[in-house]
Amino acid sequence: MWAPTVTHGGFSASQVEEIKRAVSIPVITVGRYTEPQFAELMVKEGRCDLVAFGRQSLADPYMPLKAQEERLEDMIPCIACLQGCVANMYAGNPVCCLVNPFLGHEAEGIAPAEKAKKVMVIGGGVAGLCAAFIAQEKGHQVTLYEASDKLGGNMRLAAYPPGKGDITNMIRSYIVRCQKAGVTIKMNQEVTLDLIREEKPDSVIVASGSRTLILPIEGIDNPAIIHGSDLLDGKRAAGKK
């Protein structure tokens, strides 16, 4: 069973406990574990002998080391999206990870830039945050501009439906990485040509996100029509339908 985002971590804990009581051999459990504290508790309480981290090891292969060093805020959590790992595995393609673009390229690392540049990143969604972090790690001076008062972009909206809250962990981890790397983040700042001319960046990364796909249906522009993004963002109410 490949547990999706809506399934909580450790969902099979009670079943594993029953198996542990019934057998005399070591029991290893797996079940969307992303928190080392929970895994440690399972072993300490004798509910299992070992906890296996599957997809979490793809999202962050250094998670055990970070837990040992008590750097929990640095961990990159698996959001159980099943997009880069399971979907590619069944398609016979190389496995990748939505929260860890370095998967499979760990040995390459982030090569330092030959020349440090002043970099402007437009957009504080996940793509913008990731680009800003990597550029800063390469040695550039990076400033990220977000037009609204919230980071995360469309991924933030994707986390609002019931059962999707863990998606916010992806946003949080990128924010933490940017902050620790030294990225300057400016909120409520729309980027204009005048601002670009004023700041004089060497490079500009446009990560302003996508626009909602609206089908060409007659009447779709009626004010009574509520679009999903407006509903999720709290800009419109859907009533009790």
Language-model-derived ranges and their functions:
Residues 1-122, 126-142, 150, 222, ...:
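Flavin-dependent oxidoreductase catalytic cores
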Residues 2-8, 110-116, 157-169, 227-235:
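Short, contiguous acidic/charged loop-to-helix segments that flank catalytic cores in large enzymes
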Residues 34-37, 58, 190-193, 231-234:
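Short acidic loop-to-helix transition motifs that present clustered carboxylates
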Residues 47, 198-200:
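Alpha-helix C-terminal capping/helix-to-coil transition sites in glycosyltransferase folds
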Residues 100-112, 176-179, 185-187, 194, ...:
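Glycine-rich dinucleotide-binding loop and its adjacent helix/turn
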Residues 121-188, 213:
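Beta1-alpha1 glycine-rich phosphate/pyrophosphate-binding loop at the start
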Residues 145, 201-208:
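Short hydrophobic core segments
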